[in-house]
């Protein structure tokens, strides 16, 4: 059963401007600890950061909470499996929060074209979970 659907469309120029103005501190406010290695290894750090930010926003929208504790940018890590498929890894407190709400699965899709990044997240819950 669908718990929630979230989408986010982001103009990556906003992220580039933030990096230009605030430097790596800007990235540190967005990235979860698990994302830093891939960020620094990326050929396009601003593009990487834009995709992470959009996915996190879409995740918060699918959850229906917005970005507020424990649903914070640094508690949500956008990761990739061995085939490149994106998924969300959550910090322990966020994992517990999801479990309390009956969220059992998640699906993430990311796309970009030019300066625009699109993220789409679907969260599932068990059929016995009440709204």
Swiss-Prot record:
Single GO cellular component term: cytoplasm
Major subcellular site: cytoplasm
Gene3D superfamilies xref list: 4'-phosphopantetheinyl transferase domain
SUPFAM superfamilies with a match to the protein in the record: 4'-phosphopantetheinyl transferase
Catalytic activity: apo-[ACP] + CoA = holo-[ACP] + adenosine 3',5'-bisphosphate + H(+)
Cofactor: Mg(2+)
Family designation: Belongs to the P-Pant transferase superfamily. AcpS family.
EC number(s) given by UniProt: 2.7.8.7
GO terms assigned for molecular function: holo-[acyl-carrier-protein] synthase activity; magnesium ion binding
Residues bound to Mg(2+): 8, 57
Protein task: Transfers the 4'-phosphopantetheine moiety from coenzyme A to a Ser of acyl-carrier-protein.
Name used for this protein in its record: Holo-[acyl-carrier-protein] synthase
Stretches that traverse the bilayer: none
GO biological process terms on file: fatty acid biosynthetic process
Record keywords: Cytoplasm, Fatty acid biosynthesis, Fatty acid metabolism, Lipid biosynthesis, Lipid metabolism, Magnesium, Metal-binding, Transferase
Localization, UniProt: Cytoplasm
Matches recorded under InterPro entries: 4-PPantetheinyl_Trfase_dom (IPR008278), 4-PPantetheinyl_Trfase_dom_sf (IPR037143), ACPS (IPR002582), Ppantetheine-prot_Trfase_dom (IPR004568)
């Amino acid at each position: 059963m669908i718990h929630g659907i979230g989408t986010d469309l982001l103009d990556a120029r906003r992220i580039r401007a933030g990096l230009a103005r605030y430097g790596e501190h800007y990235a540190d406010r967005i990235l979860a600890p698990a994302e830093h290695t891939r960020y620094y290894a990326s050929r396009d750090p601003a593009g990487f950061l834009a995709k992470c930010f959009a996915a996190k926003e879409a995740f918060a929208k699918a959850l229906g909470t917005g970005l507020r504790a424990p649903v914070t940018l640094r508690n949500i890590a956008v990761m990739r499996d061995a085939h490149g498929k994106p998924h969300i890894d959550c910090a322990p407190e966020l994992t517990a929060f999801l479990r309390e709400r009956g969220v059992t699965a998640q699906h993430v899709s990311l796309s970009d074209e030019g300066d625009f990044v699109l993220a789409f997240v679907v969260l599932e819950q068990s059929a016995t979970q009440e709204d």
